Regions:
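Bacterial N-terminal signal peptides
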Residues: 17-30
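N-terminal leader/propeptide and maturation segments of large enzyme subunits in energy/redox metabolism
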Residues: 412-434
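Sec/Tat signal peptide C-region and signal peptidase I cleavage site
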Residues: 31-35
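Extracytoplasmic/lumenal domain signature
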Residues: 63-79, 110-142, 155, 159-163, ...
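Long hydrophobic segments that form regular secondary structure
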Residues: 307-308, 434-481, 485-490
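N-terminal secretory signal peptides that target proteins for export/translocation
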Residues: 1-16
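Mature N-terminal segment immediately following signal peptide/propeptide cleavage
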Residues: 36-79, 96
Length: 546
């Protein structure tokens, strides 16, 4: 659930809002050039089904980028100006398909724009409660949905059968764990989708069984299309021991009928643990008919004393058979997660050059700053993975994993170690305060587990890498990855009584871990001035030679 944590840093909010303005201006110019030039589309969140995030367009380059001018701006008005986490964030990647620009807003509306002019062609409003005027809408399920990262596009591929209503569709994860199907030309709900369940125009995870307690909401990330399936994941409240299971479901793109579902939690443990969901994006390989999932930690975050058993499909890259939803292969990259090291960003599915051969790769960037690479047909590692001994937990009832998997032969793309002498401060006093705090807390390098006294987690749940993912350049065989270098302080505190489970969370890092003996208290590792103690740069862009 680090998507909530991402909003907690003031620096992150500032950079996000500045980037929003720049992105609208630059993308407007880019789309105009595309429409007038090569006509190249961007029909999926990552540009293509495998999520390479690479465009072949060459009209805009480093020689003329400074000459770009604003072509048009569009303002939806869907903005909640409130302190985190109640404020909205514009995090969307628009799609360019069907001669139209499609995107969603933090308040769940979908817009279709003319790419050349920015004029609205249609707007879909699911009549979601408006948090700006409806106090009930500020409850956690809707607060955490006040962002939308994209939609999915599908069209009939049968020759001569691509005309008429809903032959081209936009799919969107919506409130109350729904998946909407819209006519891409008009924005009208496709009445055949979901009709069998009594709600024409949308399918719902809520129609199907899910063990556990707490929140089950639609993912802020878009669904993904593979053939005649739309595949959708969900977000859950992983601060509850017996949370909802992180089930991924595939629906028929036309009827909305359930075709298969995947549950990462073993049946024998579904009454004691949950989550391991996919809140980030999913990638697919149409040629091999494979679905690639980046799963998250099982519940609860930061304390796993109630799940001292193996959940191999949590914190794992999982390849599913697109026809059945069965696991073809999986590789877990975090053992017994106590750090909120959810897998974030879709696995990038590209053919890379390595050892003189072309290899079908699935590349996984992680919060830890490691890049894992696998053969996407077999799951075999493309470079060695070793087990490294890591620090033990001193929290009563907890048992941290003895080792963690570490890739060898590929340099990390993020800072992975803190040293006292490198800590940052705007002034000598500021720096001294960071060093004093460092001395008081537990820190034994990467994978230092949460503690009673308080531990520094670095890389933190912010990353390293995060949901923006990575981009591959086929010409240079380089993978470009952005990273954040911010630490957090996590402390687990014994509860006085069960009533603490009923208290509303202060924020994502200060809350009860429901169903456990503990609550957690956390904050960014920062100085009294609110400046990160971690040394600069706090954000990087790294190119890795594959």
């Amino acid at each position: 659930m680090t998507e909530q944590l991402m909003t907690m840093t003031r620096i992150g909010i500032l950079l996000t809002r500045v980037a929003q303005t720049l992105t609208v201006a630059l993308c407007a110019a880019t789309v105009t050039a595309s429409a007038a030039g090569s006509g190249a589309d961007w029909p999926a969140f990552g540009g293509d089904p495998g999520g390479s995030q690479h465009s072949p367009l060459a009209q805009i380059n480093k020689g003329n980028v400074k000459q770009l001018k604003l072509a048009w701006q569009h303002r939806s008005g869907d903005f909640i100006d409130a302190p985190s986490p109640k404020g909205s964030l514009l995090q969307v990647t628009p799609l360019h398909a069907n001669g139209t620009l499609y995107f969603c807003t933090p308040l769940n509306r979908v817009f279709a724009l003319d790419p050349a002019s920015g004029k609205e062609r249609w707007v879909f409003d699911p009549h979601r409660p408006d948090p700006r005027t409806d106090r009930a809408a500020l409850s956690p399920p809707l607060v955490m949905a006040s962002r939308c990262r994209g939609v999915a596009y599908w069209q009939e591929d049968n020759a001569g059968n691509d005309k008429g209503p809903c032959r081209k569709r936009i799919f969107k994860n919506g409130e109350s764990s729904r998946v909407y199907a819209l006519d891409a030309d008009t924005g009208i709900l496709c009445a055949d989708f979901g009709a069998a369940k009594g709600h024409p125009g949308w399918a719902s995870h809520a129609d199907y069984e899910n063990h556990g307690e707490g929140l089950m909401a639609s993912s802020t990330s878009p669904p993904v299309v593979l053939g005649d399936l739309v595949i959708a994941a969900m977000s859950v409240n992983d601060g509850i021991a017996n949370a909802k299971d992180g089930i991924v479901r595939a629906f028929d793109v036309r009827s909305g009928e359930l075709r298969w579902e995947f549950n990462p939690i073993p049946p024998e443990y579904r009454n004691v643990s949950g989550a391991a969901n996919v809140w980030s994006t999913i990638s697919v390989d149409p040629q091999r008919n494979l679905v690639f999932l980046p799963t998250t930690s099982p519940s609860t975050d930061y304390y796993g004393g109630g799940r001292r058993f193996d959940i191999p499909l949590a914190n794992a890259i999982v390849a599913l058979d697109g026809a059945t939803g069965r696991v073809v292969w999986s590789r877990q990259v975090v053992r017994h997660d106590l750090f909120d090291y959810d897998l974030v960003g879709h696995p990038v599915l590209v053919d890379i050059r390595r050892g003189g051969k072309t290899v079908p790769a699935a590349l996984l960037q992680t919060k830890m700053g490691w890049l894992f690479g696998f053969d996407r047909s077999t799951g075999d590692p493309l470079w060695p993975i070793v087990e490294r001994v890591v620090p033990k937990s001193d929290v009563p009832g907890e048992m941290a994993a003895a080792t963690q998997p570490v890739p060898e032969g590929m340099a990390p793309f993020a800072r992975q170690e803190l040293r006292r002498e490198d800590l940052f401060g705007l002034t000598p006093l500021d720096r001294y305060a960071c060093q004093k705090k460092f001395d008081e807390l537990r820190y034994e390098g990467m994978y230092t587990p949460p503690s009673i006294r308080g531990s520094i987690l670095f890389p933190s749940a912010l990353g390293g890498g995060n949901w923006g993912g990575a981009a591959y350049d086929p010409a240079s065989n380089l993978l470009l990855v952005k990273a954040e270098n911010l630490a957090t302080v996590i402390k687990v505190v014994a509860k006085k009584d069960a009533r603490e489970d009923q208290a509303p969370p202060k924020d994502y890092l200060t809350r009860s871990l429901v169903g456990t003996p503990y609550r957690m208290e956390g904050e960014l590792f920062q100085s009294p001035l609110g400046i990160p103690c971690t040394p600069t740069p706090w954000g990087t862009l790294t190119a890795l030679d594959l």
